[in-house]
Amino acid sequence: MITGIQITKAANDDLLNSFWLLDSEKGEARCIVAKSGFAEDEVVAVSKLGEIEYREIPMEVKPEVRVEGGQHLNVNVLRRETLEDAVKHPEKYPQLTIRVSGYAVRFNSLTPEQQRDVIARTFTESL
């Protein structure tokens, strides 16, 4: 369990009024802020703090954001010129199939606006 503390008495003056997170399971302390002697986010053994007195600090725990599944990537192995030519001459590309949002779609079945959107989003100069 992790407990937030403010050190109120210590043999080491650098620890006085410093804030720490104590991990009782690991026997470790993480420095949140101290006058000197300890770096922010430094992790030390609790025993390194020596004899101390402290008061517990209430902590607000925010829920973790969990992403299930991961990323999604559509790969279309085409040249920009091929799609632009398919817009101008759809009769030459009756079987041209692309991936849009995970679905296979015939390019010619898209509206002109959707075709322009696919070309704009598929071919970028930089991120």
Swiss-Prot record:
Q: Which residues carry this modification: Glycine radical?
A: 102
**Protein's job:** Acts as a radical domain for damaged PFL and possibly other radical proteins.
Q: Report domain Glycine radical positions.
A: 5-127
Glycosyltransferase as a keyword?
no
The chain's disulfide connectivity reads none
State a GO cellular component annotated for this protein: cytosol
- The organism's place on the tree of life at top rank: Bacteria
Q: Name one GO molecular function term.
A: formate C-acetyltransferase activity
- InterPro entries according to UniProt: Auton_GlycylRad_Cofactor (IPR050244), Form_AcTrfase_GR_CS (IPR019777), Gly_radical (IPR001150), Glycyl_radical_cofactor_GrcA (IPR011140)
Lineage per the UniProt record: Bacteria, Pseudomonadati, Pseudomonadota, Gammaproteobacteria, Enterobacterales
* Matching HAMAP family: GrcA
Q: List UniProt keywords, sorted A-Z.
A: Organic radical
Organism encoding this protein: Salmonella arizonae (strain ATCC BAA-731 / CDC346-86 / RSK2980)
Q: Which NCBIfam families match?
A: spare_glycyl
Name by which UniProt lists this protein: Autonomous glycyl radical cofactor
